[in-house]
């Protein structure tokens, strides 16, 4: 099997941070070479843009925000993702372009056609081989975000914003079931872990 590009995504409060540890443990048990990274971020340029994008004080228009996301992504692809895959290393990214369709598209209202243009220009033919989409009901997401001590620029948004974000995620998953695995992360930790491990086992033929 060629090196796999796997993404982990979902609305805020879906449990990505917790379940990244599950994925790391799965790769470690099998001794598979893997690189973990994140978006926006993963490179010095990406991390600098991340600080701007998540800072509640940042006043950026929708197009500027979207372009910053893709600027960080282009650097990420060129400096991190493609080199790792070329070296035979699997890559797991905490968020990727699905998040742009969901947050800037669904949440903010950026036309999906415009995002697709940037997607093709920045990524070429690069697409994830597998996307683990963590999903929780809106009220669970909002409750978990509410427990965050300091909310970032996106976490400060209202429920209707996250409702639109979640809808885009689920619609994209329904339209391409061969790439997406929707994980109910409102279940107990053990159940969520088992679900993720089963998806990875199946994907890698374990």
From Swiss-Prot:
GO terms for biological process: dTDP biosynthetic process; dTTP biosynthetic process; dUDP biosynthetic process. It catalyses: dTMP + ATP = dTDP + ADP. Keywords: ATP-binding, Kinase, Nucleotide biosynthesis, Nucleotide-binding, Transferase. It is an enzyme of class 2 (transferase). Pfam families: Thymidylate_kin. This is Thymidylate kinase. One of its GO terms (molecular function) is dTMP kinase activity. Phosphorylation of dTMP to form dTDP in both de novo and salvage pathways of dTTP synthesis. Its EC number is 2.7.4.9. SUPFAM superfamilies: P-loop containing nucleoside triphosphate hydrolases.
């Amino acid at each position: 099997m060629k090196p796999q590009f796997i993404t982990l995504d979902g609305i805020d409060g879906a449990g990505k941070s917790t379940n990244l540890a599950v994925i790391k443990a799965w790769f470690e048990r099998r001794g598979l070479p893997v690189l973990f990274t994140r978006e926006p971020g993963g490179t010095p340029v990406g991390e600098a843009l991340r600080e701007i994008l998540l800072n509640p004080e940042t006043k950026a228009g929708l197009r500027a925000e979207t372009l910053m996301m893709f600027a960080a992504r282009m650097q990420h692809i060129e400096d991190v993702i493609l080199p790792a895959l070329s070296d035979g290393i699997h890559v797991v990214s905490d968020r990727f372009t699905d998040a742009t369709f969901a947050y800037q598209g669904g949440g903010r209202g950026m036309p999906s056609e415009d995002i697709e243009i940037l997607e093709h220009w920045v990524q070429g033919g690069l697409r994830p081989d597998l996307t683990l989409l963590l999903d929780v009901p809106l009220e669970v997401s909002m409750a978990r975000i509410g427990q965050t001590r300091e909310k970032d620029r996106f976490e400060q948004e209202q429920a209707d914003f996250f409702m639109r974000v979640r809808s885009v995620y689920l619609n994209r998953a329904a339209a391409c079931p061969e790439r997406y695995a929707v994980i109910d992360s409102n279940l107990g930790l053990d159940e969520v872990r088992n679900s993720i491990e089963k998806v990875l086992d199946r994907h890698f033929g374990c």
